[in-house]
Design a protein with these regions (language model features):
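Catalytic cores of enzymes
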Residues: 1-177
Length: 177
């Protein structure tokens, strides 16, 4: 898996996170796929992309570079030093294993190691329609109003609040700088 380092990267997909104590052979994520935990690389989180059904439907591992899974381990090996912002419009992308003295090991850390400056991610499962609305507001604030990413997200969340959406629909999005 190779990537260039554009200024902004946006993923609108499914994220997964496997807790360390998760038993093998159980459903490992709330992304709709029932696969064995041994299939995934460590660290135990990533993004599910197109092509994943080709491997998961047979419940086998693939050594192919295009297996449909972008794991945190693979992300850490990318050079994204020129990427200012990555938006992870996917469930649970802000989760990870907590290490007492080192913080959270998850997608946020993986993208930081790869060189990304700012990361927008989620702390829980986010509903599709409201996520689309929030992200549309965010990009309007970022690209048209020329707000910085932190302010653009804050203003988008404020608009969702003014539209009387419950916090569940918008508060799960955070930015890590």
């Amino acid at each position: 898996k190779t990537a260039i380092s554009p200024q902004i990267i946006h993923f609108s997909t499914h994220g997964y996170f496997i807790r360390q104590y998760q038993e093998e052979n159980k459903k490992i994520c709330d992304c709709g796929f029932d696969v064995k935990s041994t299939y995934f690389d460590s660290p135990n989180c990533g993004l599910i992309l197109s092509g994943v059904n080709n491997n998961i439907s047979y419940n086998t591992s693939s050594n192919s570079a295009d297996d449909g899974i972008l794991s945190a381990k693979e992300i850490m090996q990318l050079n994204l030093n020129n990427t200012e912002l990555i938006v992870l419009s996917a469930c649970n992308t802000g989760l990870g294993d907590i290490h007492s003295t080192e913080g959270v090991y998850g997608l946020g850390r993986a993208f930081k190691i790869a060189g990304v400056n700012k990361i927008i991610m989620t702390l829980w499962q986010v509903p599709d329609y409201q996520t689309m609305e929030l992200i549309t507001l965010f990009y309007n604030n970022l690209l048209i109003r020329k707000l910085c990413p932190r302010k653009a997200l804050h203003e988008a969340q404020k608009t969702m609040r003014l539209k009387k959406y419950e916090p569940y629909y918008w508060a799960g999005f955070i930015i890590v700088e």
